[in-house]
Design a protein with these regions (language model features):
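C-terminal binding/interaction regions
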Residues: 2-78, 83-159
Length: 159
C-alpha cells in the first residue's frame, strides 16, 4: 500500500483543515479495529456472575454508539452514513478482546469509526469493572484492516 509523504489534515500554510472529499467517488469501504483490555483473574471470574447485567454487552453497545458519533469527537473527521457497525467483546485468556467493524458507501474511509468503536468499548469495559480492580490496562487499540478508497486495501495480518 502506498504511503503518503505529508499529513492530510493541514492546508498549505500549516493550519488544521478538513480534507475536501467532494470530488471523490462514493465507494464501499470497510474497516476493522481491535483493542485488548487486560483483566485480573478476579475480574474475569466476576464477569459471568454479575447480578446487575453483562458489562461486556454494555461495552458492545457503547462501541456501536461511539462509531455513530465519531465525527463529533474527532475534529477533522467527516460525518459518514454508516451502513453497518458490529462490535464483539470476547473473554479470552487474561482479558477481553474487542473487535469493531464499520462499513459505509461514501467518499472517505471508516477507519476512525472502527477505531473509536474499539476504544470506547474498551473504556466501557474499564468503567464497568473498575470497582473490582484499578490495575486494568487497555492495550493495542489498532487498525486491523480496511478496504476501499484510493490508498487500497490494508491488512495487519492474522488477529
Amino acid at each position: 500500500m502506498p504511503e503518503d509523504t505529508k499529513l492530510s489534515h493541514y492546508d498549505d500554510i500549516g493550519n488544521a483543515s478538513m480534507v475536501d472529499v467532494s470530488a471523490k467517488q462514493d465507494t464501499r469501504r470497510t474497516a476493522t479495529a481491535s483493542a485488548f483490555v487486560e483483566l485480573s483473574a478476579a475480574v474475569m471470574a466476576a464477569l459471568p456472575a454479575n447480578p446487575k447485567g453483562n458489562p461486556l454487552e454494555v461495552a458492545r453497545i457503547a462501541g456501536i454508539q461511539a462509531a455513530k458519533r465519531t465525527a463529533e469527537l474527532i475534529p477533522m473527521c467527516h460525518p459518514l452514513p454508516l451502513t453497518h457497525v458490529d462490535v464483539q467483546v470476547d473473554l479470552v485468556e487474561n482479558g477481553a478482546r474487542i473487535t469493531a467493524l464499520a462499513a459505509t458507501t461514501g467518499p472517505t474511509g471508516v477507519e476512525m469509526e472502527a477505531l473509536t468503536a474499539a476504544a470506547v468499548a474498551a473504556l466501557t469495559v474499564y468503567d464497568m469493572t473498575k470497582a473490582l480492580d484499578k490495575r486494568i490496562v487497555i492495550r493495542n487499540v489498532q487498525l486491523e484492516s480496511k478496504t476501499g478508497g484510493k490508498s487500497g486495501d490494508f491488512s495487519r495480518g492474522s488477529f
